[in-house]
Regions:
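Core helices of alpha-solenoid repeat scaffolds
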Residues: 1-2, 27-38, 68-80, 116-124, ...
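Helix-rich alpha-solenoid scaffolding regions
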Residues: 2-46
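Alpha-helical scaffold segments of alpha-solenoid architecture
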Residues: 136-171, 175-195
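Hydrophobic residues within the alpha-helices of tandem HEAT/HEAT-like
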Residues: 14-25, 41, 54-66, 82-83, ...
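Long C-terminal extensions of eukaryotic subunits of large macromolecular complexes
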Residues: 182-189, 193, 197-304
Length: 304
């Protein structure tokens, strides 16, 4: 199969088709067979759109095509270099499209790595810097990775951790203590919270109204997670009068007319978004019939 074609549209379509086929018919050897082609494409292609699609295809090939943990981490290092250089490392200087793709692919790969402690410091520095990007998509993708890194710094409470203590949030309501903090994510946490708070309330008229809304919605969630890492995307702080507790995560995916799937953690959102980039409107069909997709998001379906 010839992957490198001269026509821009055909090339992007081929890479989407490759990713779709990998998810539909997974193979433990496909990553080894196409890694070099995909890396060469996103490094050398003159089309920014092709670079971005090749980056996403590589992340799908790595996760579903048999890459080892060390290979996943090597790709993540390469993607982080793209982010740190604002795209310059692959001849895509200041391309929001390419840097966004690198951030998104990095986050998707990170969901497959159990222990992120050693990679967290360099990653946080890169993603915090991108919060100042002039491209809203870059800002959001970087912010979602920051939230994921805070989430991954906590793991399930084990016997050695002792019993959970009763902890309360700023309004005196109980905090989930079933997860325990294992390491610090970022030294300048107060400064980070200030930056996230500014983005969550961005009011500059220089930014389009729809982009301001995107910033407000996403960075309110990200700030909430940085403050309380057990809280996932679209966590509703409002209190349910019947239970006396916060409503919690309100992000759901409707599965036909019969049920909903709750996306209450950042790793779930990263995987959902990665699958949707490839599967588009066919996600629900694949979720019901494709074991690979279901195993990526093994979430119980609730009756709606």
């Amino acid at each position: 199969v010839i992957f490198r074609l001269s026509r821009f549209a055909t090339s992007t379509n081929i890479f989407v088709a490759i990713a779709l086929s990998i998810i539909t018919v997974p193979s433990e050897t496909v990553y080894d067979s196409i890694f070099q082609t995909l890396k060469r494409t996103y490094s050398d292609s003159e089309s920014l759109a092709v670079k971005a699609v090749a980056i996403h295809t590589l992340s799908a090939a790595a996760v579903f095509g048999g890459a080892s943990d060390s290979e996943l981490e090597e790709i993540m290092d390469d993607l982080l270099e793209i982010v740190e250089s604002d795209g310059s490392s692959i001849e895509a200087a200041d391309s929001g499209e390419v840097v966004t793709a690198a951030c998104e692919a990095w986050g998707f790969l990170a969901t497959s790595i159990d222990d992120m402690e050693e990679k967290t410091e360099a990653a946080m520095d890169a993603f915090v810097e991108q919060l100042a990007s002039s491209d809203v998509s870059v800002q959001v993708a970087a912010g979602e990775n920051i939230a994921l890194l805070f989430e991954k710094s906590y793991t399930a409470r084990e016997t050695d951790d002792g019993p959970a203590s009763d902890e309360e949030d700023e309004e005196g309501l109980p905090i989930d203590t079933s997860f325990v903090k294992r390491y610090d994510v970022y030294r300048q946490k107060d400064q980070l919270k200030h930056t996230l708070s500014q983005l969550a309330s961005e009011s500059s008229r220089r930014i389009a109204k729809k982009d301001r809304k995107v910033l407000h919605t996403n960075f309110s969630d990200i700030l909430n997670t940085v403050e309380y890492p057990s809280r996932g995307p679209r966590y509703q702080n409002a209190i349910n009068e019947e239970t006396g507790r916060r409503y919690g995560s309100r992000m759901v995916v409707r599965i036909h007319k019969t049920g909903t799937m709750k996306i209450d953690a950042w790793w779930k959102l990263h995987r959902l978004q990665a699958l949707r980039r490839v599967l588009g409107g066919g996600f629900v069909v694949h979720y019901e019939n494709n074991e690979v997709v279901f195993d990526s998001l093994p979430i119980m379906i609730s009756a709606s």
